[in-house]
Amino acid sequence: MAEEVNERTRLLSQSDDPSPSLEELEEWEEPRNWKVSYRWLCIAVISVYGLISPVIAAIIVPAMPQIATDLNVTDPGMLQAFVSVYVLGWSFAPLVVGPLSEVYGRISLLNTGHGLFLVFNALCAFARSDYELLILRFITGAVGSAPLSIGAGIIGDLWAPEERGLSISLYTLGPLLGPAIAPITGAYIVSHTSWRAIFAWCSLYILITWVVGLCTLRETFRPVLIQRKQAAAVRKGQLPGSVQHHHKSLADVFRQDLRRPFTFLGTQPIIQVLSLFMGYLFGLNHLSITTFESVWTDIYNQTPSRAALNYISIAGGFILGSQITGSLNDRIYIYYTSKDPAKGTPELRTILMLPAALLVPTGLLIYGWSAQTHSHWIMPNIGIGIYALGLIMSYQCIQAYVLDCYAVYAASAMGALTILRSLLGFVLPILAPLIYRTLGYGWGSSLLALWALVMGGLVPILLWRYGAVLRKRSGILEEM
């Protein structure tokens, strides 16, 4: 009996009909039915994976003077590029890794990427010229981006929609918290050793987490688990030898899977809107991180090591916002669905984006104008903390919305978001010196706050009003 191969599972050839028990997972095999403690262990490991890549993006900021001296770098733009080109690397790998994880599985690609991440980050410590370091930083960013695209898919594999809030809060905390704590760590290392030691210590961290991941993580993607179950049954003779799980040719992978993020970005208005908004937030975060130290060294005349301690305010805002959003997101979802399960739509994730739309610009205004007027040092810290709280609220709501909409293809959807997210994360920090030099911290932050208010207000309103209609008209979502 011929059956059409399901695009999401790609399990069998079209001419075979295996035992029904092998077409599905047993209850105990379902990732969402695994022990809660183990599922949280998986989330913790991928969150730790996701933390180190953003840390390495910003940890060299306090080491810029040493790098400039050691590698004879005289162009400030080149120093800024050491950070920006790393972020640019994030925009490429997820376009490949995300779709491939939906063909070959999440964990194998995640661990392979982390191993390559270890190798190229270690090589950065041996760079002898600015261009060597620039190229190695780009490659390191690319291979280190796997957790940023695959992690959301793993959360969707392990948790039901009403349970995802806290896991998303933990997972998204790392990529945003990393750049905030990185300068503190980098300043400490540089003050005691050299900039090359930064890469050595980070490589040690990557090695330890990689070993932990290899020992603890197992595949979570349901279609791949079914494929492996059927392949094992064939090897054991429990299925006829003619029954083989479907293997895609390399041409099929390129034609169907690797183009999926571009298809999402080109045909899905939801992805287009959210990628612009998320890209702006991501770029804004890296702009703030890379210029934050100069506020304290240039305006408040603090030493680099003392200036780095002010990043605690950013970290505090991220941690507080993460915990608030994770808990409230689940409570809001459960509240609406307990009355009517049909109300359990992705649009519930946009509710918390509205208060976040006020927090981000408010924090930026307090931060920028207090720095401009040389107010007490606590005021810029309060402002940047409020901004960080609102930013992570928006960030987590976007992740949750996309995950609810594109559960099966979550990794590809995140890959589509990554394109503009990383490009703006690359461009905005480069423009930061021009913005603040031309407008000052007050008006420069006001300009950034205005865009944050407009986008932060419009996006949740548009999705709440038209999100269901757009999802209904989406041909991709109809196939899922």
Swiss-Prot record:
Function: MFS-type transporter; part of the gene cluster that mediates the biosynthesis of oryzines, natural products with an unusual maleidride backbone.
Membrane disposition: Multi-pass membrane protein
Predominant cellular place of this UniProt entry's protein: membrane
Pfam families hit by this protein: MFS_1
The protein, known as: MFS-type transporter oryF
Biased composition (Low complexity): 11-22
InterPro entries membership: MFS, MFS_dom, MFS_trans_sf
Keyword field contains rRNA-binding: no
SUPFAM superfamilies: MFS general substrate transporter
Cellular component GO terms, alphabetical: membrane
Ranges annotated as spanning the membrane: 41-61, 81-101, 107-127, 138-158, 170-190, 197-217, 264-284, 308-328, 351-371, 378-398, 415-435, 443-463
Annotated segments matching region Disordered: 1-24
Subcellular location: Membrane
Entry keyword set: Membrane, Transmembrane, Transmembrane helix
Keyword Nucleus assigned: no
Source species taxonomy: Eukaryota, Fungi, Dikarya, Ascomycota, Pezizomycotina
A Gene Ontology molecular function term of the record: transmembrane transporter activity
Family label: Belongs to the major facilitator superfamily.
Compositionally biased region (Basic and acidic residues): 1-10
